[in-house]
């Protein structure tokens, strides 16, 4: 890889770090190509990315970003998972690591907050942004539904009263 390619890779990584809300560092201890492809596919489906890059280039790209505190985690064969949704990559990686002992979670960062292994696992247990949005919409819609029911209830009662009078007069 020549200097121009390295500079392009560093610029690409830097833009990735600047546009993400979480970075998770994993150590790949002999993942096969099929396993790595399966992990990348799961990450893509979750809206995240998973990149293997040279540690030195990743360190250079981390300089000046909010994630530069994770420089110390970049030792050995590492890969970086990034996403705008902080929960998505954590869930995928934790689930994948449960079934595959060749993937080791090293840590990560969410903004300026550095996460250890336990922090990444705790992050994976949180609901995703889509789940939170669905809950908020449900909470917002519930009072509106109740208001409509309350407003319609007197009209329904009034209709029943008129129906009873009509039935009484017919009898």
Curated annotation (Swiss-Prot):
It comes from the Bacteria. GO terms for molecular function: large ribosomal subunit rRNA binding; structural constituent of ribosome. Signal peptide: none annotated. PROSITE patterns: RIBOSOMAL_L10. InterPro entries: Ribosomal_uL10, Ribosomal_uL10-like_sf, Ribosomal_uL10_bac, Ribosomal_uL10_bac_type, Ribosomal_uL10_CS_bac. Keywords: Ribonucleoprotein, Ribosomal protein, RNA-binding, rRNA-binding. The keyword Ribosomal protein applies. One of its GO terms (biological process) is translation. GO terms for cellular component: large ribosomal subunit. Pfam families: Ribosomal_L10 (PF00466). The keyword Disulfide bond does not apply. Belongs to the universal ribosomal protein uL10 family. Forms part of the ribosomal stalk, playing a central role in the interaction of the ribosome with GTP-bound translation factors. Part of the ribosomal stalk of the 50S ribosomal subunit. The N-terminus interacts with L11 and the large rRNA to form the base of the stalk. The C-terminus forms an elongated spine to which L12 dimers bind in a sequential fashion forming a multimeric L10(L12)X complex. This is Large ribosomal subunit protein uL10. It comes from Rhizorhabdus wittichii (strain DSM 6014 / CCUG 31198 / JCM 15750 / NBRC 105917 / EY 4224 / RW1) (Sphingomonas wittichii). The lineage of its organism: Bacteria, Pseudomonadati, Pseudomonadota, Alphaproteobacteria, Sphingomonadales.
